[in-house]
Amino acid sequence: MKLKLVIDSDSDDYRLFKTTISTVAQLRKTAVLRFTTDRLIVVSTPKTAASGAILSGDQGQLWCTIPRDIFTLYNVASIREQNAIAMECQCDSLVNVLRRYERCNHGPLTIKLQSTPEWNQVHTGIQQGEENKPMGNPICALSCAFTEHLGYEDSGKEVSHVFKVGVRLLYKSQDARIVEPMVNYTKLLMFQLPPVNGEYGSKFTSFVKRLDRYATLNHLMIYGDRNSDRSDEGRLRLLVQELDWKLDVQWRGPLEMIVQDDQPSAVPASEPGLVGNVRHLNAGTSMQIEDSEMDIEATDIGNVSTSRPSTSVSPQEQTSQVFIKAKDWKVCSKLYDSFEEVVLAISHDESCVLHCSLDRGTVDEHSTKSKERGQIIYYMARSKPL
């Protein structure tokens, strides 16, 4: 298998790459990087196997999509379908390399997958003559190389830096188990959240973070419905119904609803054909790496009102509600603060999805066609039934 990427820090596309990796690093220590012919997919979930190499579970999954054309060179080759290469990576290590790269007088950053045989041997005994035996998943390195200019670029010296980030390659069977969650579209409401830098951004941030102060809170209900006065606007509420106290936090500002096109009953939240097809990577087992030289009083907070709920609202034709873990909602507040375009989708009594888009402008200055956007999607399964 071969992997070589080149990206320039002077381009806006580098910001997409850095933002995605940094966002994952803030939420999780590890992530799976899945390189395919068309894009890089970053997957992270809080549940890991004892080996640290296999991700499983369906709560709090973070799926990020980075199009291949953000790189000036994108060379990925393997014997698996779509040339897939999957590996587990320590996010902090990769972010530290990017920070070091940004402090230099910029040239391109080259990332290559390199074999590291010395990292794959472990001495299993102390008896003389006993051979070293390889570990389970092959451990390799993402070699990150760039040049730093000292002094003036014309007359100064150049220093080459190479940093190696350890990664653990995933076998075909392990990669196949990492499947994007499905969203049930039969009863789904979607809301375009106010931009964080817009008129209502600061007030909506207060709404999202209203429950962060309650450290012992386990579950909360996300309740959404259509505004009876205006069909193109929705309403959003956060309800707490614990044993000893109840709370109802309502968003009183504008909230745009997104009208669904005809959708299958259950599909991934990412665009059809974008991320959904990558879960069928079931071919190839080779791990050979080639050189890649190729009870609370009612209060008001801005447009947020909090009060005791009177009674629970039964599901209606235009309502969706679901219980999720309070910790998952705290992750949503972090993601909302980081992106301009955010969509919240509520699948009744099944799941909640936060979809963040990263705009990349148009193909060129004379074109109106937009480039493929980067995506960060946070899937939250219900924590308990209604």
Swiss-Prot record:
Protein localization: Nucleus
Keywords per UniProt: Cell cycle, DNA damage, DNA repair, DNA-binding, Nucleus
GO-annotated cellular components: checkpoint clamp complex; chromosome, telomeric region; site of double-strand break
Chief location category: nucleus
Family of the protein in this entry: Belongs to the MEC3 family.
Subunit structure: Component of the checkpoint clamp complex composed of DDC1, MEC3 and RAD17.
Record protein name field: DNA damage checkpoint control protein MEC3
Species: Eremothecium gossypii (strain ATCC 10895 / CBS 109.51 / FGSC 9923 / NRRL Y-1056) (Yeast)
Gene that produces this protein: MEC3
